[in-house]
Amino acid sequence: MAPKKDGKATGAPQGFTPERFEKELKELATRAQEDTFTKRFMGQGFVYFQTLLLLGLLGVASSASQLNLSPIFGSIPSAVTHTTALKAACFIGWAGNLMLRMVLPMSTSQLLPVIALNIPAIQFLLGTFTDRLGSWWGPLIIEGFTLFPLAIVSAASVADVLEDADLSALPKFVADAAPGIVSWGLFRLAENQSMEKLQGVIGSTFVFTRVGIEVVLGAIYAIMAPSKYLVLAIPALLHTAVLNTHVMTPMATDALNSTLTAQNWTLLERRESLTGYVSVIESLERGYRVMRCDHSLLGGQWVQLNGRRVSEPIYGVFVMLEAVRLIEREAPLPDSEANALVIGLGIGTTPSAFVSHGIDTTVVEIDPVVYEFAQKYFDLRENKPAAVADAVSYTADLVKQSKTYDYIVHDVFTGGAEPVDLFTLEFLQGLGDLLKDDGVIAINYAGDFGLPTPQLVYRTIKKVFPSCRIFRESPRDEANVEKWGSDFTNMVIFCRKTPGEVTFRNPKQKDFLRSQVRQALLLPKYEIKEQVFLEDEVTDVLSKNETSKVTKWHQDSAAGHWKIMRSVLPGTIWEQW
């Protein structure tokens, strides 16, 4: 007989022991804590992601605004009021976010794409009034209707988002101040970085053109906050697509040419590049063409004269630079044995002449589009391809290679002011190292003689090159000085590396290259005595670490240059791009 089973339970099932139950409770509690932490972490991460995205987009929009103003005003006038007004706009948006939330029929995030998508059309329409607005009020008013509303609403949106930021771990005074201060710093970082990056890719595709960047920004804002209010941007989008000649498309270019042809001008080609908006335009009535970069001219030449085809420079300063060949030496130097370094190409007037004379000529030009257009539209002559590079680093490499030259031509200019880095003592000393002992340098300087800058630049040049003579492109015109409020002109400074008199031999017929313009302008005429620049006891020079000495006067110089450019070409040429 089988034994009887014991009716007493030997113990509770393993899954229901008190120890097991307690363990499960602890696990549930831990999981609940983890879920709360994960949610909080994800929530805070999203807050800061939105903040960074809004600030980054505003930084890019700020850079795009400046890029769109530079063809109409130049980069320097465009920037005069830019940062100050942006500070005011961001402060208004940051401080007034609650008011905007109450009065707007939509959220600030929904308003952002409406503003952004309207910007290209507003810039175009207001740009047609720049002759009347001038170079100071013009940028301020245009950005006042475009970038600054975007900045106000962006700052308000950031303030709204950061209301959900958990700053309880910080002291109260830090938590109160940090969001605004850090947001402004991040915006400025985004603005500076975006401008630097955009200049490297500008013009490479439609997305990276001036108007293209703004259209893409508007699309991103719309994706972030889609709403029924986007219909308010449809008229502006249609204008940008059909009527805005600033858009870099074949249709817009054809429309622009139709407008220009009615005024006896034609656009041969245009491109956006790292130094600015570059184009070649031709006067059908007067028979000359010029290369434009933003709101300045890099040079020009006659192509039709009295019904016959010609190729003559129209600006005397570039012909004057060729006179560096005429400076007398102890031992005459045949052109076939000479070599030259030309810094800054423009349309290539001076290097083409050197090559025509048989001089071995090296050209360094930073902008590949300028080089391409000089080849394509201005009969650029070469005996070797130009070096497309930054002049500072390129000449430093030449010094390391112990290269030397008989002639150096320094011919650089940017939108109403000298490029400071190329007039510093350190850069000029590098050119001195590249110049042979009996070599000669010609430096083209464009600036306002009513400002201290020309004196400072000349003292710096004299620190390196002991013997110099200075010539204006044209005599001082008191009527123009009164009209424009400045004495802005080109001057060419001819210098020797070693002490000795700077004298010019009389040009021969072959020096003129069968050019009537060279016959009239090759030999410099309007000399300025160096005492004009050295009459006071000031001895300071322009060093690499002290460029602020010059930049503080750039605004006045650029304003004078803007007025002159508006008298050289009609305002509609500048405004239409």
Language model: regions and residue ranges:
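Transmembrane alpha-helices and membrane-interface helical segments
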Residues: 94, 152-157, 211-219
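Transmembrane alpha-helical segments of multi-pass membrane proteins
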Residues: 108-122, 143-150, 169-187, 233-241
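Membrane-anchoring hydrophobic segments
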Residues: 2-152
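A positional/structural detector of protein chain ends, strongest at the extreme C-terminus
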Residues: 1-5, 574-577
